[in-house]
Regions:
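DNA target-recognition domains and sequence-specific DNA-contacting regions of bacterial/archaeal
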Residues: 26-144
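Non-catalytic DNA-recognition/assembly elements of restriction-modification systems
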Residues: 1-54, 142, 146-186
């Protein structure tokens, strides 16, 4: 179900912003839509309930967030194409950028835009794949009308909320399964 919802949201993104992009939309830079921020070291934080994201996904849970708002996480080192959308308090490690939105209703647009880019091909590292804020900030992106962004948000936000709810339910069901299996085999 979650994959299907994400595919629907991505299809809508392509339909609205690629196939039917308005010629009136100007081309701008990513820096006009988001501020790209560096993640920070997490090793001195105590365990808690806040997810810590690295380029491979959630690494652990800590006591406090680095950022508490909607964000798009972009790998700085490693798996450069593993773009992550987050809409809950989180911590981002120092090998992962996070973004602060400068405009309303742009996070999911930016998420799908970045997923459509081959960031791995923009690698500036030698031994380890690497990304820079300068490169991300300079990415050329169409700046859609506010009404188009609002319409997109109103359609895909419920999809993202359903995905989030489903992920919580899956985690609970896995815990029940593990408990029951443990009882069955003990």
């Amino acid at each position: 179900i979650n994959d299907n919802l994400m595919q629907q949201a991505e299809t809508l993104y392509r339909y609205l912003f690629i196939k039917n992009a308005s010629p009136k939309w100007r081309t701008g830079s990513m820096a006009e839509l988001v501020s790209v921020r560096y993640g920070k070291d997490h090793k001195k934080l105590a365990d808690g309930t806040i997810p810590v994201y690295g380029s491979g996904g959630v690494m652990r849970f800590v006591e406090r967030p680095l950022y508490e708002h909607e964000s798009v996480l972009i790998p700085r080192k490693g798996s450069l194409n593993n773009i992550i959308y987050v809409n809950q308090p989180f911590w981002s490690v120092d090998t992962m950028f996070y973004t602060e939105m400068k405009l309303c209703n742009v996070a999911k647009y930016v998420y799908f835009y970045l997923k459509s880019q081959n960031l791995a091909a923009m690698n500036v590292g030698s031994a380890v794949p690497s990304m820079t804020t300068e490169l991300l900030n300079s990415l050329q992106i169409k700046i859609p009308s506010n009404s188009t962004l609002m319409m997109f948000e109103s359609i895909v936000d419920p999809m993202f909320k359903t995905i989030s709810h489903n992920q919580i339910e899956i985690k609970k069901l896995m815990q029940v399964r593990d408990y029951l299996l443990k009882k069955l085999f003990s």
